[in-house]
Amino acid sequence: KIGFSFARPEASRLFANEILQGAQVVHPLLKTQLRQLVAEKARILDGWIALGKLSAMDTTHFFFTVWSMTQTYADFDIQIAAVLGDDSHSETAQQRATDHVLRCVWRICGLE
């Protein structure tokens, strides 16, 4: 997801704008297909938690957290560039961001 945010930020922003405007086009898919997909994936994570492979967490909200961490790099790339400077779009800067997001995810999951 973060790679997509770097590679296609305009597509990510288009989706975000659709959501911010009430999701009139995609709302039926969000309520059905996305809801079902998240529930299925959350059940898998819940199973891993029950086996002691992951730290206890709200697995549905875990997806929101990952989405927000990755979506930010597309939706707020101008803000990020202003804070980080001109090299924010470099491969090194993108790798730094990816490494940070992954460390956060591992930490949430208790896998660090």
Located regions from the model:
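C-terminal peripheral helix-coil segments that are non-catalytic and often amphipathic
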Residues: 3-7, 35, 39-53, 59, ...
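A local structural micro-motif
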Residues: 13, 56-57
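Short, conserved alpha-helical segments within structured domains
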Residues: 22, 58-62
